[in-house]
Curated annotation (Swiss-Prot):
Keyword annotations of the record: Aminoacyl-tRNA synthetase, ATP-binding, Cytoplasm, Ligase, Nucleotide-binding, Protein biosynthesis, RNA-binding
Organism: Staphylococcus aureus (strain Newman)
Claim: DNA-binding is one of the keywords in the record: no
This protein's record includes keyword Cytoplasm: yes
Assembly with partners or alone: Homodimer.
InterPro entries, per the entry: aa-tRNA-synth_I_CS, aa-tRNA-synth_Ic, Rossmann-like_a/b/a_fold, S4_RNA-bd, S4_RNA-bd_sf, SYY-like_C, Tyr-tRNA-ligase, Tyr-tRNA-ligase_bac-type
Residue ranges annotated for the S4 RNA-binding domain, each copy included: 353-420
Protein name: Tyrosine--tRNA ligase
Amino acid sequence: MTNVLIEDLKWRGLIYQQTDEQGIEDLLNKEQVTLYCGADPTADSLHIGHLLPFLTLRRFQEHGHRPIVLIGGGTGMIGDPSGKSEERVLQTEEQVDKNIEGISKQMHNIFEFGTDHGAVLVNNRDWLGQISLISFLRDYGKHVGVNYMLGKDSIQSRLEHGISYTEFTYTILQAIDFGHLNRELNCKIQVGGSDQWGNITSGIELMRRMYGQTDAYGLTIPLVTKSDGKKFGKSESGAVWLDAEKTSPYEFYQFWINQSDEDVIKFLKYFTFLGKEEIDRLEQSKNEAPHLREAQKTLAEEVTKFIHGEDALNDAIRISQALFSGDLKSLSAKELKDGFKDVPQVTLSNDTTNIVEVLIETGISPSKRQAREDVNNGAIYINGERQQDVNYALAPEDKIDGEFTIIRRGKKKYFMVNYQ
């Protein structure tokens, strides 16, 4: 019998590799399955590049299975070589603990806790930290062949430039994790990104060697790619974080709404919980009326609401509409800073107040003649209000919070003027 969840994952394009396709399907049809996905606390927030494996784990929870969310307080002290061309910088224990705290809060936004199939949050330092060096070498290292490890892509790719013994042992530590969760919490499936295949299969192999035949499986999801070849998960400002202090909900919303027609349907399948019928309808809308950008708006709304909540989504939409219409007066200083984070930043002396001189000194207009023309022609806006008086002097109330002024030239060229 085909499993409904597996069918949905296949339709969404979320299955990259499985250790035993039929075995996983039979298991899901037979029982409520406990499965896990992990992340090392390399920062105090996840970014959207981390999101897909955990959203996939959440889909299992939606179908009645129990997710374990593992935060690598132990492995995070070591560093995963997978997908990295050079050695990671080791973090202090204090920094790792701070990162764990931040990521744990975000997991409570992604998963349901406290139900009969509620998520379980674990930290692998709790068991890895109890293993002595002698025990590590005798009880675990004895079962892992060096040739086997050298065959792993994550190791092979680093051999030419060098890899420390610290990172070389990482895959064994992750293998121990899967074995521990399998024995202690009856965890039978590990979910991860495609770069985790080697670590996942190492865990299954270690269990087989230590315990004999073991009911354990692995499933990986594809690397998220964009049609233009650019790296997914980056905006002009850098990584798109789940932490609202690092990436505001407005910036988060804008990232999703700006996805291309070529990518938006794939991302609706990947990152939202909308069903096939609704996504098919949005695909039809994209094909027949692409100018409406209904698919992009839906993607932005669904993901922003899921991560940040309905109030934050409404604020993001309000800011977007105000910036689009030029109604800047309705926004707070923080909202304006968020909204204009990526526009050119120019610095102005507090002594310069005449509008023409302001335009010249900041380089907004290329010459005095052009500056006067811009003002006379109604092309200059101060904080959203048109200014056509060439003798106008910037007043204290034009300085938002006494810090900056937003000047627009023409229809779309915005500048943030900061004072010194």
